[in-house]
Swiss-Prot record:
Domain of life: Bacteria
Assembly mode: Homodimer.
Biological-process GO terms, alphabetical: glycerophospholipid biosynthetic process
Disulfide bond among keywords: no
Lineage: Bacteria, Bacillati, Bacillota, Bacilli, Bacillales
Role description: Prenyltransferase that catalyzes in vivo the transfer of the heptaprenyl moiety of heptaprenyl pyrophosphate (HepPP; 35 carbon atoms) to the C3 hydroxyl of sn-glycerol-1-phosphate (G1P), producing heptaprenylglyceryl phosphate (HepGP). This reaction is an ether-bond-formation step in the biosynthesis of archaea-type G1P-based membrane lipids found in Bacillales.
EC number in record: 2.5.1.n9
Entry keyword Lipid biosynthesis: yes
Species name: Listeria monocytogenes serotype 4b (strain CLIP80459)
Homology family: Belongs to the GGGP/HepGP synthase family. Group I subfamily.
Residues the entry annotates as binding sn-glycerol 1-phosphate: 6, 153-158, 183, 203-204
Catalytic activity: sn-glycerol 1-phosphate + all-trans-heptaprenyl diphosphate = 3-heptaprenyl-sn-glycero-1-phosphate + diphosphate
Residues that, per the record, bind Mg(2+): 8, 34
Protein name: Heptaprenylglyceryl phosphate synthase
Gene from which this protein is expressed: pcrB
Length: 225
């Protein structure tokens, strides 16, 4: 997968727009959000996308994101926080409550490094965002070699990141996949970041300018995934 659209269930998107996203050339979708996420909205969005053969990932930020029928679950593990709630605390609580029923083969953990200090998710998770390039590379190595996480996700959350940081962090990984998200608003930015990232995630621009969002995916339309 080279390109994923990230959809917020708390935001409305017409069915016609969803159809355009499905046929844009993207490789799949992430359903996830930080604020005002209701299970009914998650269910509706998942069902609207249900007819596509593209993979649909549910990113579990809280219990309202859990749909038992979903094919793929993403579990964020925030690496650059000192609040253990976001590294393993909430995870342990959920496993304690539902562990016997969790479809582990459909669950993938993703090591997050959040780098936009003004983002809601940074405030929520108490992320330490004033990191050097060396700090971020070290987190990449931590994700792969200590925690053995399958995904290392650098999240600039609405702000376009530094391609050089992405290049350095990606180069530090051998087996863990590098995902990049944040501020991609043009096909040129998509092409720039995908030179280094295994997968780019495009989100906010969907709700700001759909046509520009579609352009970020069309460059992948003829490529083999």
């Amino acid at each position: 997968m080279k390109h994923l659209f990230k959809l917020d269930p708390a935001k409305n998107l017409p069915m016609n727009d969803l159809t355009k996203l499905v046929h844009s050339g993207t490789n799949g979708f992430i359903i996830g959000g930080t604020d005002n996420v209701q299970i009914e909205a998650v269910q509706k969005l998942y069902e609207l996308l249900g007819e596509t053969d593209l993979p649909i990932f549910l990113e579990i930020s809280n219990e309202s994101m859990i749909l038992p029928e979903a094919d793929h679950f993403l579990i964020p593990v925030v690496l650059n926080t000192e609040n253990s709630k976001w590294t393993h605390g909430l995870h342990q609580e959920l496993i304690k409550e539902m562990g016997a029923f969790i479809p582990w083969k459909r669950v993938t953990a993703e090591g997050y490094v959040i780098l936009n200090k003004d983002a809601k998710v940074a405030h929520l998770t108490e992320a330490k965002t004033d990191l050097t390039d060396e700090d971020i590379v070290a987190y990449a190595r931590l994700a792969e070699n200590i925690f053995h996480l399958p995904i290392f996700y650098v999240e600039y959350s609405g702000m376009y990141g530094d391609p050089e940081v992405v290049r350095k962090a990606s180069a530090a990984l051998s087996n863990t996949k590098f995902w990049y998200g944040g501020g991609i608003r043009s096909k040129e930015q998509a092409a720039e970041m995908v030179k280094y990232a295994d997968t780019i995630i495009v989100g906010n621009i969907i709700y700001e300018d759909l046509e520009k969002a579609l352009e970020t995916a069309t460059i992948f339309r003829k490529k083999t995934v």
